[in-house]
Design a protein with these regions (language model features):
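Short, basic, low-complexity termini and linkers enriched in Ser/Thr/Gly/Pro
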Residues: 1-8, 14, 19-24, 30-49
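Structured soluble/peripheral alpha/beta segments that form catalytic or ligand/cofactor-binding pockets
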Residues: 53-397
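Intrinsic disorder/low-complexity signal
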Residues: 4, 9-10, 17, 349, ...
């Protein structure tokens, strides 16, 4: 099954009459599951007694967990949700672009049975490709959805390779991450070489998202990936270089009903340091105490940051002409113990996603420029920011 830009297999149009699918971009914690998955199941899932009465549950992210690389780049189907997420900034002469390519694996049945129809669905795959033309102030995005039947989508357990149709990410023999995607607005063919080892977020291999056992993920990042390749855009092919960031998370049952959304930041400074921060926002307007971050140093070592160790202040706002949602649109970020004071500004105002989506989840995610001071010295940089729950509450995972 392939669903993209309104295309459906024969026989499903009657069930979907009145809807137009243009599901786009990335959903950091696969928050669309609670609203969209029942629909997918009702339309596509072949009935099975095993699905109705599972004999085991999906595995939860519980400490301690020791990452093993390169094995942990690969798929972890014992967990319900998993995503591989790439963002970066590409340059060719005077042109600058931001890009995003993300793959999701969503487990539906923790007890898949051997045999039966090849179309029986125990896993769904989603992929999102987005491009920000920073000079032209344009933003484009597309999503692919598929099941693993006939190898239309998949993620290997023995080595890192994930794909949907002709979109893919894999670990090459050279240890470079090789990513490929194409859409009507652009295509990319990039090789990403880590300049630093993987950074493990949280404590004991677990990044806690909300209180309670298992309400967490196993989460690591490659925070500085030297990037080369080609970008085809508006009929022209650019040889590009740049920096990318890769996240990989897997877990089950992470969020609570009390959480409305989150703000997430990945920042790459030009002094060879990086910063990741996220805050989970509750319905009463406060931050979840488990919100945290990670400071990454020039030598690849890192330091965990608890919520009280950093400050995030919105200094501007932007109201979407599409959804009417109002988002923070500029930020001051401080990490006093690291002597970091930063200002973030979006490269393009309108980087809102999901405005024509069937699932009805609307959020903002896009590239930002960074200016400020680090240890008393001027610093610049680049990053990506994700904002959810500002136009309606985000369903939980």
């Amino acid at each position: 099954l392939r669903i993209t830009d309104g295309g459906f297999p024969a026989g499903t149009h009657r069930a979907l009459r009145g809807y137009r699918i243009r599901i786009t971009a990335r959903y950091r914690y696969a928050f669309f599951l609670s609203s969209f998955l029942p629909f997918l199941l009702s339309v596509f899932l072949l009935s099975s007694p095993t699905l109705a009465q599972p004999t085991k549950a999906f595995k939860q992210a519980i400490p301690p967990y020791t990452f093993q690389f390169p094995q942990d780049h690969a798929s972890h189907p014992a967990y319900q949700t998993e995503w591989w997420y790439y963002t970066g900034h590409l340059q060719s002469n005077d042109r600058i672009f931001g890009y995003e390519l993300t793959f999701f694996r969503v487990g539906i049945n923790p007890n898949p049975q051997p045999g039966g129809s090849r179309w029986r669905m125990h896993t769904l795959y989603f992929a999102h490709f987005a491009l920000t033309d920073e000079d032209g102030e344009q933003f484009f995005h597309k999503e692919e959805i598929s099941r693993p039947a006939l190898d239309m989508a998949g993620a290997r357990e023995n080595r890192f390779q994930v794909w949907i149709n002709d979109w893919s990410a894999e670990l090459a023999d050279s240890a470079a991450h090789r990513i490929r995607a194409s859409a009507d607005f652009a295509s990319i063919a990039l090789d990403l070489v880590p300049a630093k080892p993987p950074v493990i977020h949280g404590h004991d291999g677990v990044s806690q998202k909300s209180p309670g056992v298992g309400r967490a993920s196993h989460y690591y990042s490659l925070t500085r990936l030297q990037t080369t390749g080609t970008l085809t855009f508006e009929g022209e092919t650019f040889e590009v270089t740049g920096l990318s960031w890769m996240d990989h998370e897997f877990g089950s049952n992470q969020l609570t009903d009390d959480q409305k959304g989150w703000d997430w930041f990945s920042l790459q400074l030009d002094n060879n340091r990086e910063l990741m921060l996220y805050v989970m926002r509750r319905k009463d307007g406060t931050y979840e105490p488990t919100s945290s971050g990670t400071m990454i140093y020039t030598d690849g070592t890192w330091r965990h940051l608890s919520l009280e160790m950093f400050e995030i202040e919105a200094t501007g706002a932007w109201t979407s002409p599409h959804s009417g949602g109002t988002y923070p649109h500029a930020w001051r970020i401080a990490v006093p113990s690291e002597q970091i004071e930063l200002r973030l500004t979006p490269t393009v105002s309108d980087q809102e996603l999901g405005k024509n989506s069937l699932i009805g989840v609307i959020y903002w995610e896009g590239s930002v420029v960074v200016r400020g001071t680090d240890q008393g010295r001027p610093v610049t940089g680049q990053g990506y920011v994700e904002l959810t729950g500002y136009k309606g509450r985000v369903p939980g995972l």
